[in-house]
Amino acid sequence: AHRITEECTYCAACEPECPVNAISAGDEIYIVDESVCTDCEGYYDEPACVAVCPVDCIIKV
């Protein structure tokens, strides 16, 4: 699974890219539901959210 760190700028680029709808808007940053996140296995070669994040704030946990 992946996690979005406090460096998130709330740009919303990641949310529509998630094929399993694991990303949602939190109060100040976007949140990844780690129980739903599949690291895009079976969908993409790399996690889609990581690929589109402009500030590289999405990390593997």
UniProtKB/Swiss-Prot annotation:
Any one Gene Ontology MF annotation carried by this entry is: metal ion binding
Cofactor, free-text remark: Binds 2 [4Fe-4S] clusters.
What SUPFAM superfamilies is this protein classified in? Answer: 4Fe-4S ferredoxins
Q: Where does [4Fe-4S] cluster 1 bind?
A: C8, C11, C14, C53
UniProt KW keywords: 4Fe-4S, Electron transport, Iron, Iron-sulfur, Metal-binding, Repeat, Transport
For the 4Fe-4S ferredoxin-type domain, which residue ranges apply?
A: 2-27, 28-61
Please list the residues that bind [4Fe-4S] cluster 2.
C18, C37, C40, C49
At the top level of its lineage, which domain of life is listed? Bacteria
Cofactor(s), by name: [4Fe-4S] cluster
Functional summary from the UniProt entry: Ferredoxins are iron-sulfur proteins that transfer electrons in a wide variety of metabolic reactions.
Annotated protein name in UniProt? Ferredoxin-2
